[in-house]
Amino acid sequence: MAELKNDRYLRALLKQPVDRTPVWMMRQAGRYLPEYKATRAEAGDFMSLCKNQDLACEVTLQPLRRYDLDAAILFSDILTVPDAMGLGLYFEAGEGPRFERPTDTIDSIKKLCIPDPEDELGYVMRAVSTIRRELKGEVPLIGFSGSPWTLATYMVEGGSSKAFEKIKKMAYEEPATLHMLLDKLADSVTLYLNAQVANGAQSLMIFDSWGGALSHHAYREFSLRYMQKIVDGLTRHADGRQVPVTLFTKGGGLWLESMAETGCDALGLDWTVDIGDARRRVGHKVALQGNMDPSVLYGTPERIHQEVDQILASYGEGTGHVFNLGHGIHQHVDPERAGSFINSVHELSPQYHK
């Protein structure tokens, strides 16, 4: 593997000195880019794009050709793991992901097998190794997975949900059944992420997109507990370097202290949290990633610049901050506005690292 030329992102996650705040964007390889749309059209559909290692590599690299970013993130989907468990993932126009065979009974959960990441998920591993090779050491590669709770919401509901009725019913009516599912998912995700590291991922991120839908105590029982299990089982060194781990619960501002106790290296923040307040609460333990509202990218370059300035000032001096959006970039954002965002971070952040 080529030697890493820009390790700013990894250093910031480990709270080591950097010359400026590193920046990347969640969903930076995505529908806001015309070149992504062209490659997706070539693939035919979303999962065909994910399962073609060369096309997955191409879309991963596209934002790096446009922007001076400090990290690449594997192009894939959080639902690859449940798909590999045999649930029959498909995408309904206008409705998002669906499963042919939801796991909403104890019998269906008992039948689930933990997928072999090098077999059923081998296409992801081939994409990871291809991307790592093609990056040529320019920036580090982030691997990722959904959290057990978030994956379980799709598996039990049969797809996307707003109220999470089925899985919350299971949580309170049959908690042992849900714990069985979450336990299998934690084991599956641990294997999956470790395989990504073995194939070249240099940092890991766990996306807990729906943890914020849980009550204060239910979050600890059904989400955090299983992210803790994963963190405990992850490969934390590879290629002579630490492999930093970031946890991101959307709507998780209530639980930053508890999340920081897991032993992860960094926490992702959504835009509802003040990053300066988050630093005061947990900055002695973990780095922070975030957290501009993605909708700010609809604003003028001046408005974007102002928001970046405000977030940098709120975090303050020193390392331990990776600039990002508070969630994925919206598909209708002008790519030029994303460029304004990245340029503003480059321009404004060095003063905080003298």
UniProtKB/Swiss-Prot annotation:
Coiled coil: none annotated. The record marks 77 as: Transition state stabilizer. Homodimer. CDD domains: URO-D. Its EC number is 4.1.1.37. The gene is hemE. It comes from the Bacteria. Its main location: cytoplasm. It is found in: Cytoplasm. The lineage of its organism: Bacteria, Pseudomonadati, Pseudomonadota, Gammaproteobacteria, Alteromonadales. It comes from Shewanella pealeana (strain ATCC 700345 / ANG-SQ1). This is Uroporphyrinogen decarboxylase. GO terms for molecular function: uroporphyrinogen decarboxylase activity. SUPFAM superfamilies: UROD/MetE-like (SSF51726). Keywords: Cytoplasm, Decarboxylase, Lyase, Porphyrin biosynthesis. It catalyses: uroporphyrinogen III + 4 H(+) = coproporphyrinogen III + 4 CO2. Signal peptide: none annotated. InterPro entries: UROD/MetE-like_sf, Uroporphyrinogen_deCO2ase_HemE, Uroporphyrinogen_deCOase. GO terms for cellular component: cytosol.
